[in-house]
Swiss-Prot record:
Family the UniProt entry places it in: Belongs to the RNA polymerase beta' chain family.
Tissue spec. comment: Mostly expressed in flowers, and, to a lower extent, in leaves.
Quaternary structure (record): Component of the RNA polymerase IV complex. Interacts with NRPD2, NRPD3, NRPD3B, NRPD4, NRPD5, NRPD5B, NRPD6A, NRPD7, NRPD7B, NRPD9A, NRPD9B, NRPD10, NRPD11, NRPD12, RDR2, RDM4, CLSY1, CLSY2, CLSY3, CLSY4 and SHH1.
Binding site for Mg(2+): D447, D449, D451
Top EC category: transferase
UniProt keyword annotation of Nucleotidyltransferase present: yes
Main localization (coarse): nucleus
A GO CC annotation given for this chain: plastid
Chain residues that bind Zn(2+) 2: C97, C100, C121
E.C. numbers: 2.7.7.6
Record's protein name: DNA-directed RNA polymerase IV subunit 1
Binding positions (Zn(2+) 1): C56, C59, C67, H70
């Protein structure tokens, strides 16, 4: 039995780093045990288990747990280029000249002063440039290198008349019989591996080492054969024994053995074998462009790439875990978890045996001993089977889970810190489910509709201590995301708390109060009513008194919003409202945490029990009568009529908003006197046009929601006070008023989140369902075959209570039943992984800074928190900030993503990915208005309109009413003009409304032609643009106050005439698209309102927000960025814009314009706004840390693997293993191996994967180093007294100090001085207090000690550690201490004074310089503090020639 329990010994060592490299031929020979010379040796028994012999012929093992397998090697007949280096070799060959092997530069013209170069380096010699490239971009098909003639150079030769290449153009390539050059193009050659070696032969080795660091692995003369265990896919058991089935790699290995083809074929087979490696199979694609053309889908490994990294290398498996469904149990305490007895018996807890727990542990093992007659314990490093009598102290016993044990509970996904809670076990007689108090659902973000909880049973003492001290529920009462309370009242408790305070007739007698007092932690107060009535002499208590029994004595709390006042634990006042009871800012639980944090859990648990019992006594149920809201038929009728009126009013508001759009203003002028019978058709037209435009739909939805709030308010007007739905809604415990309105009153607005091919009719009736002209039929108009896009929009007037007709049911299904976030359901998880990838290793260091464990890089100088810095030292602050934002992203999934509303989730994604360098089609700029506009009435409104009018592009086509081409030749002109003249008619009313003139239009067209004439690509000289009040072609049109603008083409010559089609198809579209006002690059300008916290603050503005303009521009403009172009456009209106607050919304562009500090501020403001839109509140320190982690290198990087890799590259802390855990492990490992990178495993994820402890948090390691110097303690010293007496002294200023100033006390000066200063606490002490502690005698002893030290050493001899420490401290009292210390003190020595034969102390600085000083000046500085009246006495005694001066003494040193 002991043999069965024997465990394998694991090698012990300290892992410091891992190195990556490409194996060379020597490495493969050393790790192989067999040279494969025949195809059948690929599955040889010497390559490990499993094999046909069932025994490993190398190590003799028969168990796969002992034998992990052995490698073999296949030697090739000739060397080939390692396929991994083909890309680097091609890049290196492109840098050098193939003829002279020098670094290739631009070809130049030979002159007398220039040295002679080879024909490939010289211009105009007929030898064009060439380019080397691999045969394909895919890594697994790079079997060779191709060289091609540069097409641009070849075209230049053809223009000079040289049609063919010189005969010796390819002479730099040695002849290779394996390549038939006759079938190749004359401008292209396939280079064999032998030819590559020949080209690399003459290149400078330094250049090769720079581009190919692992050059010794370039040649591939052998290939490794993996052990059998990595290639066996199936074991089939037959009558004659087991039959092994190997994977596709085994077949390819056999094809490599004894291969006799050319190098290109051999390289192709090597790449085919690499394709089937587990690590590289992540690039296998099911598409047509698969990396391996010979691949079969059935041969693709199932566990591949990133999944292999996560499941095999990063996945940690344990037998001490469980997962099951959770149910609610309010009888459990908040920190308890109910575990079924059947599950508890199967979970084991390790515990060391000692005298205190021996009896308890032996008793717990009685059932086991009755069944098995023996028990297993771990004694030392071995598992042994023993009897009870053989137990020894120190044995590790494995017992079943018991009451009082601690387990770690978690509900995936763990998106925030508090989803991991250590809870106390309580064994329950249940089956298959765990039980949880409903109040604890909030931190787990779960409920009881089938959610599962994961449990982890700690085994080590360290793990148990960490659970109790770090993640226990009583240690997580404050939510680290928003700084408020983590727990709050549950649904039933919250409803009861609201009712017990709101109900005016809530009175309780003595029996009821005594019954409820059993659940309250504090005493029963005196009754509020001594005698209720003559018939009832029993005293009465109010509901407020009942609820006040939950507050401890001395508790004071106010909540002005609900008029709540609590004084000394007594609830004095309260008005209708439940905000102070909910999980909001300033609630009573948050105040209880500040009053007495240790009692909060008990108070919340007592409140739940008491309030649930009171609600059970009172009763609360929901019936169909609650849905009717009204108590009688007439009230219900009135409610229905008001709902109908409210919906009509909301529709009118939408129509008015639609008429305010500029494109609909003509409708008011034309239809202002329409007949009444046409109004119905106009409303139908409004509805139809609204659904065809996303802008109009967005405007209508916003206006309808604003007007619809009045309809929702009818629920409170007509609903009874006893309505259970309204009670729960007011209490905030269940549902919302919107759902109640949909069920009881009307469903209301229904709009689709995506565009559809059909629309909704204005009235959702059965007649509209059957109408052939309804928008439901799709296309409308003459061309019924065209497909139009709609944004469906409709209003359902019925409710679920009254029922829906078929069309209303269809509309509701189309709009509401669609999965609004199905396309972005994985987005929060992606953001969470990326944020955690960036911030996982950021922690609070012990010096108060925030650092990254990679290279100990500084992220923040101080962490901006309200609490003391010591409380967060060692914490993983980056993970906390990442979790805070991740939770906000997950909460945004509940908000729909549609065309009509901005998605908070996508907005948050765009803010976090601001560092991406991907080209953006559009960029936005924020322009804030200048303060001087406030001096005018409505100055900001008029100013914003004027800026918009100046910037927004107004195309020529928008003001032109008629365009035509007239044939009117002119023969009397000096310049040749085209006979085709373009006429454009413009109404003067339009010009006036657009604030334009005919002259300004002509000027704008001329400017646009001069700046954009290259876009025309027409053979013309110029355009003659004029304006006139009469038109030769249509005089009747000019009578309506129209202006005619003519455009005539100036021909290059009289013989060249521009064709009519060129004018019609090219010139006229160009002119109509030209802007006559605004900028060509500006797409649109929106006037928006922003709340004050989201906008840069303006001095002296008391408003809650302000107007600003959002300018949308088309991408980047080459050398000129969008911001520069906008500045030039705004030159005429510079004074109207506050340029100190205006900025580009693109963070990278903002940083390039204003610097990284301004970009950081804008990023934090945008991030705060995006988080606020999700409905979550996050502490500002989390937002600042996210901004600093992304911009720690001086610029914002992309939130992806490339951005993280760039940070590691800038900080010179490569971490390929950590990056491989995030994405593309094969590419990460391959790149690191080709560069020979060493990974120091500084991160947390790589440290844990390799069995190390992360270097922060509770895993922060330190070592005690013994100094080789002798400290000189002759008698035993109490280490605690010694450590408490050692103080750190700050550098003092040489300026005189008053009695109110503070200084730092002396440190360990001398043994005689130590007894007097040990009582100091190391903090700043007033000088007046120092004088009461130290005396002149202490100063004399200090002077004598320094004199003794000075004369105890030889000249130029360094002081020992103790004396050096004393002199360093005293040096701080020197009046010129800063100048004496300089860059820093390396040591103190005794030197000969420069001013005589006496000795003095000399500072040895860290830069190698020396500076002497007099210790008398230092003692005199101490005298000035302790005994200023003794200064003249000390000077006369020790400083013979010293005289007191302002700021110091005249003694030389």
């Amino acid at each position: 039995m002991e043999d069965d329990c024997e465990e394998l010994q694991v090698p012990v060592g300290t892992l410091t780093s891992i190195g990556f490299s490409i194996s060379n031929n020597n490495d493969r020979d050393k790790m192989s045990v067999l040279e494969v010379e025949a195809p059948n040796q690929v599955t040889d028994s010497r390559l490990g288990l499993p094999n046909p012999d069932s025994v490993c012929r190398t190590c003799g093992s028969k168990d796969r747990k002992v034998c992990e397998g052995h490698f073999g090697v296949i030697n090739f007949a000739y060397s080939i280029i390692n396929p991994y280096f083909l890309k680097e070799v091609a890049a290196l060959l492109n840098k050098i000249c193939p003829g002279c092997k020098y670094i290739r530069k631009k070809q130049f013209q030979i002159t007398e002063d220039q040295p002679e170069r080879c024909r490939y380096c010289t211009l105009n010699t007929g030898y064009p440039l060439m380019k080397f490239r691999v045969t394909t971009k895919e890594v697994f098909r790079r079997s060779g290198i191709v060289v091609e003639v540069n097409e641009e150079s070849l075209m230049k030769l053809k223009k000079r008349g040289v049609l063919t290449l010189p005969p010796d153009y390819w002479s730099f390539l040695p002849q290779d019989s394996n390549i038939d050059e006759s079938c190749l193009k004359p401008t292209r050659r396939i280079i064999t591996h032998a030819q590559v070696y020949a080209l690399l032969l003459g290149i400078d080795q330094r250049l090769i080492k720079k581009d190919i660091p692992m050059f010794n692995s370039l040649g591939l003369t052998s290939f490794p054969v993996t052990p059998n265990g990595y290639r066996v896919t199936e074991i089939v058991h037959q009558f004659n024994g087991a039959r092994l089935i190997f994977d596709e790699r085994t077949r390819i290995y056999k094809k490599l053995v004894g291969f006799e083809g050319n190098t290109l074929e051999l390289s192709s087979r090597v790449m085919e074998c690499m394709q089937y490696s587990r690590l590289f199979s992540e690039t296998v694609s099911s598409s047509k462009d698969s990396a391996n053309p010979y691949q079969k889908k059935s041969d693709t490994p199932k566990l591949c790439g990133l999944r292999f990294m996560k499941d095999v290398l990063l996945g940690k498996r344990s037998d001490h875990t469980f997962r099951t469904v959770v149910v609610g149990d309010p009888s459990l305490k908040l920190n308890e978890i109910g575990i079924p007895e059947s599950i508890a018996k199967r979970l084991q807890v390790s515990e060391h045996l000692n005298q205190c727990n021996k009896e308890r542990l032996v008793t717990s093992f009685v059932p086991t001993l009755l069944d098995n007659k023996e028990m297993h314990v771990r004694r030392g490093d071995r598992l042994v089977a023993i009897q009870v009598n053989d137990l020894q102290t120190g044995d590790k016993i494995f017992r079943s889970l018991m009451d009082g044990d601690t387990v770690l509970m978690n509900r995936p996904p763990s998106i925030h810190q508090h989803s991991l809670i250590a809870m106390t076990v309580r064994i329950l007689p249940t089956t298959s489910v765990v039980s949880l108090n409903p109040i604890c659902c909030l931190p787990f973000r779960g409920d009881f509709d089938g959610d599962c909880l994961h449990g982890y049973v700690p085994q080590s003492i360290q793990a148990k201590v960490e659970l109790d001290e770090l993640v226990a529920l009583d240690k997580q009462l404050i939510n680290r995301q928003n700084g408020r309370n983590l727990l709050s009242l549950g649904q039933d408790s919250l409803t009861a708390a609201y009712l017990v305070n709101v109900e005016k007739n809530c009175y309780l007698n003595r029996a009821q109060m005594q019954q409820l007092q059993m659940y309250c932690p504090f005493q029963l107060p005196p009754p509020a009513i001594i005698k209720a009535s003559p018939s009832s002499t029993e005293p009465q208590w109010t509901g407020m008194q009942l609820f006040g029994m939950l507050f401890p004595p001395g508790f004071d709390y106010t909540y002005p919003l609900n008029n709540v006042v609590v004084s000394n634990g007594e609830l004095l006042s309260f008005s209708e409202g439940s905000a102070w009871l909910r999980d909001g800012e300033g609630n009573f639980i948050e105040r209880l945490l500040k009053h007495d944090k240790g009692k909060v859990l008990d108070i919340i648990y007592s409140a739940q029990e008491m309030l649930s019992q009171w609600l059970l006594m009172r009763g609360l149920s929901v019936s169909l009568a609650d849905l009717y809201l009204s108590s009688d038929l007439q009230s219900r009728k009135n409610l229905t009529e008001e709902i109908s009126y409210g919906l009509r009013e909301a529709e009118q508001v939408c129509n008015k908003q639609q008429l305010m759009v500029e494109s609909w203003r003509d409708f008011l002028a034309v239809n202002g006197e329409d007949k009444e019978e046409d109004s119905v058709s106009d409303l139908a037209r409004f509805c139809y046009e609204r659904q065809k435009s996303a802008t109009l739909s967005e405007l209508a939805v916003s206006a309808f929601k604003d007007a619809y709030r009045d309809v929702q308010a009818l629920a409170y007007r007509y609903g009874d006070q006893s309505n259970s739905f309204l009670i729960m809604s007011k209490a905030g415990s269940k549902g919302n008023i919107g759902k109640l309105v949909q069920h009881s009153m009307c469903i209301g607005l229904q709009n689709s989140a995506v565009s559809l091919s059909f629309g909704f009719p204005r009235e959702l009736t059965c007649a509209a369902w059957n109408d052939p002209n309804s928008p439901l039929r799709g296309a409308k108009g003459k061309d019924s075959t065209t497909t139009e896009s709609y944004v469906p929009y409709g209003v359902i007037e019925n409710s679920f209570l009254t029922g829906l007709n078929p069309l209303e049911s269809f509309v509701h299904s189309v709009t509401s039943r669609d999965s609004s976030f199905s396309g972005n359901a994985d987005l929060p998880g992606t953001l969470s992984r990326r944020l955690m990838f960036f911030m996982r290793d950021i922690y609070a260091a012990y010096d108060g800074t925030v650092r990254n464990s990679f290279g100990n890089q500084l992220v923040q100088f101080t962490y901006e928190t309200d609490g003391p810095v010591e409380d967060i030292t060692g914490e993983a602050l980056g993970s906390l900030s990442a979790c805070a934002l991740s939770e906000a992203a997950y909460s945004a999934l509940d908000q729909p993503i549609s065309l009509l509303e901005t998605s908070p989730l996508l907005n948050l994604k765009n803010v976090l990915e601001c560092g991406s360098k991907k080209g953006q089609r559009e960029q936005t700029m924020s322009l804030y208005l200048s303060e001087y506009l406030s001096k005018k009435k409505h100055g900001f409104e008029y100013g914003s309109l004027e800026i918009k009018n100046h910037l927004e592009k107004l195309s020529f086509s928008e003001i032109v009413s008629t365009s035509m081409i007239i044939f009117s030749p002119s023969s009397n002109t000096k310049v040749p003009l085209s006979p085709w003249v373009c006429h454009f008619h413009i109404s003067e009313k339009v010009l006036k409304r657009k604030q334009l003139s005919a002259e300004s239009v002509v000027s704008s067209l001329n400017e646009q032609y001069k700046s954009r004439n290259r876009e025309l690509k027409l053979d013309i000289v110029d355009l003659d643009i004029q304006n006139t009040n009469h038109c030769s072609s249509d005089d009747q049109a000019m009578k309506d106050d129209n202006v005619c603008i003519t455009v005539t083409v100036v021909e290059a010559s009289k013989h060249s005439v521009l064709e009519l089609d060129a004018i019609r198809l090219v010139l006229i579209p160009f002119l109509l698209d030209s802007p006559v006002k605004g900028d060509q690059g500006i797409k649109k300008v929106n006037i928006l309102w922003t709340d004050r916290p989201k906008a840069p603050k303006r001095n002296g503005n008391h408003l809650a927000g302000e107007l600003y303009l959002k300018v949308t521009m088309y991408g980047d403009r080459g050398k000129r960025n969008c911001w520069t172009a906008l500045l030039e456009t705004c030159l005429p209106i510079m004074d109207m814009i506050d340029w100190g607050r205006s900025h580009p919304d693109n963070i990278r562009q903002c940083c390039s314009v204003y610097g990284i500090d301004a970009g950081r501020s804008i990023f934090v403001a945008n991030l705060e706004s995006a988080v606020s839109d999700t409905g979550k509140e996050i502490l500002r320190e989390h937002l600042l840390l996210v901004a600093d982690s992304l911009s720690v290198t001086g610029e914002f990087v992309a939130l992806n693997a490339k951005g993280w890799s760039k940070q590691r590259q800038v900080e010179s802390t490569p971490a390929p293993f950590t990056q491989a855990c995030f994405s593309s492990p094969s590419q990460c490992f391959l790149k690191a191996a080709k560069e020979g990178v060493r990974d120091d495993l500084q991160g947390s994820i790589d440290a844990l994967a390799w069995g190390k402890v992360p270097g922060f948090g509770t895993g922060d390691q330190f070592e005690i180093i013994i100094s080789p110097k002798v400290h000189g303690f002759t008698t035993p010293v109490d280490v605690y007294d010694l450590l408490s007496s050692t103080k750190t002294m700050r550098r003092t200023n040489s300026a005189p100090k008053s009695d109110k100033a503070t200084v730092q006390p002396f440190g360990l000066l001398h043994s005689a001085f130590l007894k007097d200063i040990k009582v100091l606490d190391g903090k700043g002490i007033p000088m007046s207090l120092l004088r009461t502690i130290f005396t002149w005698k202490n100063i004399e002893l200090l002077s004598q000690s320094l004199k003794r030290i000075l004369h105890s050493y030889e000249i130029n001899e360094l002081l020992n550690e103790r004396d050096e420490g004393l002199v360093k401290m005293v040096l701080q009292l020197h009046p010129n201490s800063v100048e004496k210390i300089g860059p820093g003190v390396k040591g103190i020595r005794v030197a000969k004074s420069k001013h005589g034969d006496s000795c003095c102390f000399e500072v040895v600085r860290i830069d190698g310089t020396f500076e002497d000083f007099s210790y008398h000046k230092c003692v005199l500085g101490a005298t000035k503090i302790i005994a200023p009246k003794k200064m003249n006495f000390y000077k006369s005694k020790y400083l013979k020639n010293g005289t007191l001066e302002s700021g110091g003494f005249s003694e030389n040193p």
